[in-house]
């Protein structure tokens, strides 16, 4: 199998803040575009499409890119369109009511870990059924108003797309994602700097930048090692879903489990139940054992506590 990789990873990535050029009357569109709620709201997608139907198709139905590229004269025209503004206000009112409903405090809160999430085609952090299930799980948790947080990876390339060579061989095409054109946001500290999670590996440290995708009411925190703090070798950890050799795969699983727990700790997030979707994140429970023992419990007590507050979903119950 041939592998074709985009050269987009060659430059050093810098943070550049691009302010929206939206007129004040249309600011609600930007807020809704940054929450993946639109991906399962037909009214929201219809609203975005109506801004510029031809451009909506060109940007592959990505509302972030739509708002970046739409002509300013068109925006000024829309800002005076009473019918459009009324529809926008109606969709936004539904969105706001949805987002402000408080979860039932009597229900257990959940931290969910998964290697991939199929939320929408514009966010390439999934490959197939496992990711689609995880994405639907978050959407249903949001609709059911479960107090949930999720952890995963922000892949620079995601999963490859397939093409065929002249002699019929598969070519794996990896295309870099431009994170600033996706429905995600940097997680910032009180000084306005992106939060970095320092993850101790044996004999070295990996530094993961934190991003957040808002999946309705559910925050999905995404770890990203493709930054200047890491060696070129370790930047690759989050380059591709299920990519690289076995060493890179174990680094990924270590980062998801150990790094994911450290990320939640850094954000001050604690949940009642920790759910691993497949074994990729199983090391999160090792980190939890360490934390409980360091807090004063003996190993047996810590083990019982972890066992009682863990969920595990397996998708391949036979050797594969």
How should each PLM-predicted stretch be described?
Residues 1-320:
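Catalytic cores of carbohydrate-active enzymes across secretory and cytosolic contexts
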């Amino acid at each position: 199998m041939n592998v074709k990789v985009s050269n987009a990873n060659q430059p050093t990535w810098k943070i550049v803040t691009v302010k929206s050029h939206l007129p004040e009357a249309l600011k609600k569109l930007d807020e809704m575009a940054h929450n993946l709620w639109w991906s399962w709201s037909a009214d929201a997608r219809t609203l975005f499409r109506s801004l510029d139907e031809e451009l909506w198709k060109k940007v592959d139905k990505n509302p972030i890119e739509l708002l970046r590229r739409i002509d300013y004269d068109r925006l000024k025209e829309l800002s005076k369109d009473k019918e459009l503004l009324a529809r926008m206000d109606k969709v936004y009112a539904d969105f706001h009511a949805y987002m402000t409903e408080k979860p039932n405090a009597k229900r257990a809160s959940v931290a969910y870990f998964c290697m991939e999430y199929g939320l929408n085609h514009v966010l390439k952090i999934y490959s197939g059924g496992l990711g689609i299930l995880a994405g639907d799980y978050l959407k249903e948790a949001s609709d059911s108003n479960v107090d949930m947080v999720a952890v995963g990876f922000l892949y620079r390339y995601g999963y490859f797309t397939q093409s065929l060579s002249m002699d019929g061989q598969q070519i794996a095409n990896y295309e870099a994602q431009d994170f600033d054109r996706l429905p995600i946001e940097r997680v910032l500290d009180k000084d306005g700097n992106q939060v970095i999670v320092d993850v101790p590996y044996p004999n070295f440290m990996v530094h993961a930048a934190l991003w957040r995708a808002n999946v309705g009411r559910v925050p999905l925190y995404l770890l990203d090692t493709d930054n200047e703090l890491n060696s070129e070798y370790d930047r690759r950890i989050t380059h591709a879903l299920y990519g690289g050799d076995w060493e890179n795969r174990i680094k990924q699983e270590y980062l998801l489990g150990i790094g994911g727990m450290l990320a939640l700790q850094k954000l001050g997030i604690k949940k009642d139940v920790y759910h691993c979707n497949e074994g990729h994140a199983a090391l999160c429970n090792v980190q939890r054992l360490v934390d409980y023992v360091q807090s004063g419990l003996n190993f047996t007590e810590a083990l019982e506590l972890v066992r009682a507050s863990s969920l595990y979903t397996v998708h391949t119950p036979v050797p594969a």
